[in-house]
A protein has these predicted regions:
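C-terminal and inter-domain tail/linker signature
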Residues: 2-164
Length: 164
């Protein structure tokens, strides 16, 4: 289950609700329940993962986001999230979330850990923008290890929007 090391005491009720919702989304991602994750997204949400690797993307719409989450799930099985820092602010109609997160998993049979910064914009509780800034050097090394271990998808280029 996704965990939060950061304290959320002393913050507004809206921020505490945002933190619980965020953790539920990470927990769903841990279990591969990407439909549940996408229920938290607005229909035209934009996901930006800054990278030249297989996880790199600038996508919008639930169908393309599902493709990204499915690839993420295949490349990082048995993932676990730990939120180290969490900040939420703004009214429910224009809320911003920033989180510093650690992912632990297995890459080609060896323990793997990476950190990323996660920035979300929500409108009325739905994610409209999801920006992920990950330790790209660590992920690029992991991608090469995955490809060498028989996961050719790890060597593929970033996802492009599906043709309409």
């Amino acid at each position: 289950m996704a965990t939060m090391s950061a304290s959320i005491s002393g913050v507004s009720l809206i921020s505490r609700i945002a933190a619980r919702t965020y953790l539920r989304g990470l927990a769903a991602a841990e279990h591969g329940d990407f439909d549940q994750v996408l229920r938290q997204f607005a229909p035209r949400c934009e996901l930006i993962f800054v990278s030249r690797t297989a996880l790199g993307a600038r996508l919008s719409g639930r169908a393309d986001l599902l493709r990204w989450f499915e690839r993420f799930g295949r490349l990082l099985p048995d993932r676990r999230f730990e939120v180290l820092r969490f900040v939420a602010g703004g009214p429910v109609w224009d809320q911003r979330i920033a989180a510093h997160v650690i992912i632990r998993s297995q890459i080609a049979g060896a323990p793997y850990q990476i950190q990323f910064a996660h920035f979300l914009t929500l409108r009325w509780g739905k994610v409209v923008e999801d920006l992920i800034l990950e330790d790209t050097a660590t992920w690029e090394t992991a991608s090469r290890r995955l490809a060498a271990a028989g996961y050719p998808e790890a060597a593929e280029p970033p996802l492009a929007p599906a043709a309409a």
